[in-house]
Amino acid sequence: MKKPLRQQNRQIISYIPRTEPAPPEHAIKMDSFRDVWMLRGKYVAFVLMGESFMRSPAFTVPESAQRWANQIRQEGEVTE
């Protein structure tokens, strides 16, 4: 008998982006990407939404962080 791939009644945890007034001063801007900053050895995207920045989870590659930023930006355009 095969096991089900995931637990049926388990809640799906989704990431709720943090909002910050600005990227931290110790973050290093990645020049080749629009929204990606290097923070403690990981890549984090900061997207300006209204008056504050939304912060992505930490990624190991900058392309992933930029992809997240693009997706957040698209979702923001849809809701406005």
Curated annotation (Swiss-Prot):
Protease recorded as keyword: no
Biological process, per Gene Ontology: cell division
Molecular functions per Gene Ontology: DNA binding
Keywords: Cell cycle, Cell division, DNA-binding
Transmembrane region(s): none
UniProt superkingdom: Bacteria
Function: Activates the cell division inhibited by chromosomal DNA over-replication.
Family under the similarity heading: Belongs to the CedA family.
Protein name: Cell division activator CedA
Organism in which the protein naturally occurs: Escherichia coli (strain SMS-3-5 / SECEC)
Lineage: Bacteria, Pseudomonadati, Pseudomonadota, Gammaproteobacteria, Enterobacterales
